[in-house]
Amino acid sequence: MGLSVKTGTVVWNERKELLTPDETNTTLLYNTNVTNDNKIKLTKFKNDEKQQYINMEGSTDPIIVVNRGNGNAKYTFKYALIEKFAPYVVENHLNMIYPTTSMDKKKLTKVFKQVIQSFENPKTREFIALFFGNNGLSKTELETILPIYV
């Protein structure tokens, strides 16, 4: 499909000095920003040290983010398409699906649509429940084990 997976690179509590409430900075996407209906919703956190924005260079490339899980709670399979988004970086509790080959916008949209349709397939949730149980979904598992139903 011309896609690969990597884990978000920002560990927010190791970058506290770069966090800011200033919306003119880069958006830091957390797994808690992914809603149950698989959209992104920015938020104000209860923990004052945790902020939605960060003073770092970001990307505007389209990706799909997938919840990795926290290790201390029941795993919930959630994902969201990130496109037409302000510059962003991704926190380490999310995996990112991104293109590894050059694709025009039309082709990339088609490929991402196939992935999302597969994620919406009831077989995907059934597979996750059987194979992963309450454990999180690693980069390697997402890339090599989770089936994409086309």
Across the structure, where does each feature detected by a protein language model lie?
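Polybasic, glycine- and aromatic-enriched phosphate-binding surface used to engage nucleic acids
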Residues: M1-V150
